[in-house]
């Protein structure tokens, strides 16, 4: 067995089912595990802070690293700033109010919120390399997309839809999103080195493209944790705008506004009717075999499922999954039963294993970044267990008083959602 496959097996064993006994480890023990696992995953930066004080800071570079899809979460902050600045009246503003060409058909029903919650219903190819990376104007590509589901009716991760956000921000802010964020967030936070990929039309990408150092990404996380207040005490965003980022989406408990909501624990087991579902949808025998091999397993995360598929299928598992599962309209919930604990953290995550994790109860901000290399080995180098390990670190620490800013419980989420949706101007609540 190769070294990569051996480490993959170790990580998969951890991900399949995390023993509750691990919660009794000391913080020092968990930090040692994270440092060891971070090195095994060839991380370029692992930074963990508590109340802004580093607990672990291991880095091979201080240079900006491409955040991949974690860029989306920072894009959402720009929308929050538009609310604060009064340039966007409501998250439920129809996109057609900004782009009049959408006033016809079902597109007139798409709101800014739907773009942020992945519920727009716009046609989308799961693999960004197929359609998006070669497009000269990503805003126009999104505007021209067909509708494949009723807007607002279902969660479907959508790179194409998020590429419309930079266009919206530019029209409402009067400047490109990179310039807007530099003036309103980056410069006040001391972020001076960053890069943002642009399409041929000169528009910064929405789905990815932003590069930051681990420390600068942690500064974004600390701003979230502190409810919009910078380290020097300056308020950069309203606490309300910050809280909107992690309110549960109407169509998925996993997401807020382009931020992921992380439960303390989750378990996935194969549904008894999974084989029938796979056959009815025409899924290939090869992928059926890989999924049905999980019949007697319990997975502790979606990432563990993906690691299982990688082991079963090899290097081409991702395009196969995108074509056979996502492309046929199937979701994990169609094949696996799930259980999950209370939401205790939120995260910005990106391809290759870019992670920003915030645990409000213990005031932890954690970052893991890795540079893109030809030698990148999935699932080892993706370090998909990093968010779960940060939650485990938080659970190993003594309980603190409830934080002033955090993730609302179910009742709080419902109250906030109801209040937001019943007003034309959320920022004045």
Q: Positions of the model-derived regions?
A:
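Bacterial N-terminal signal peptides that target proteins for export
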Residues: 1-8
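Bacterial N-terminal signal peptides
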Residues: 8-19
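Boundary at the C-terminal end of the N-terminal hydrophobic targeting segment
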Residues: 21-25
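A short, well-structured edge-of-sheet supersecondary motif
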Residues: 28, 32-61, 356-359, 363-367
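Active-site SXXK
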Residues: 52, 66-91, 115, 165-169, ...
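Active-site helix/loop module of the DD-peptidase/beta-lactamase fold
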Residues: 85-122, 144, 173-212
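Penicillin-binding protein/beta-lactamase superfamily catalytic region
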Residues: 179, 194-326, 332-358, 375-378
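Short, gly/Ser/Thr-rich active-site loops of penicillin-recognizing serine hydrolases
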Residues: 377-429
